[in-house]
Amino acid sequence: MKLLLAAFLFILVNACTPKQEQTNRTSAAATSIIEKNKELIKTVYIEMVNKKNFTLIDSFFAPNIFDHGALEGQQQGREGFKKAVTEFLGMFSQLEVKQEVMIAEGDNVATRETWKVTMTSNNKTLTGETMHFFRIKDGLITDEWSKGWEFLGL
């Protein structure tokens, strides 16, 4: 009887261990993807927004990027997005964006930022908070939502 019980426990313990290891590997892989997605968004703000390096748009955004906050008449896709971002950020002679919060889950990253901008048209400095939501697939941003632009008076 003791031998049977020992054999049963041995099988039970060994049968559970690989599943736990698989769960740990899956969890580690998911965490790695989430961290890569967060790093992508941080880089977008540093390089594309703060430094106005628009040549990197092709490296960050999918060809079929869908801007859920597109202005009327804005073309969807990378070229339309590139034009809209270039024109929008071109309104500011000075620009500083600071990420206050970043949360990521799966293929989604959400951010809250503080913007300090100086308008090219009237040299007026404005400060406000916005929120952005991104969906990322295969290392490229496929969808973007944004809220909070009221502080610009547009």
Regions found by a protein language model. Name each.
Residues 4-12:
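Sec-dependent N-terminal signal peptides
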Residues 16-55, 59, 63:
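Short, low-complexity N-terminal intrinsically disordered segments enriched in polar/charged residues
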Residues 54-105:
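A solvent-exposed, acidic/Ser-Thr-rich amphipathic alpha-helical stretch
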Residues 57, 64, 105-108, 134-142:
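Short, solvent-exposed coil/turn segments at beta-strand boundaries
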Residues 90-94, 117-127:
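Short, cysteine-centered beta-strand-loop-beta hairpins and adjacent loop/turn segments enriched
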Residues 96-97, 112, 126-131:
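Short, surface-exposed coil-to-beta transition loops
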Residues 107-115:
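A short hydrophobic beta-strand element
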Residues 129-154:
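Short beta-strand edge/turn micro-motifs at domain boundaries
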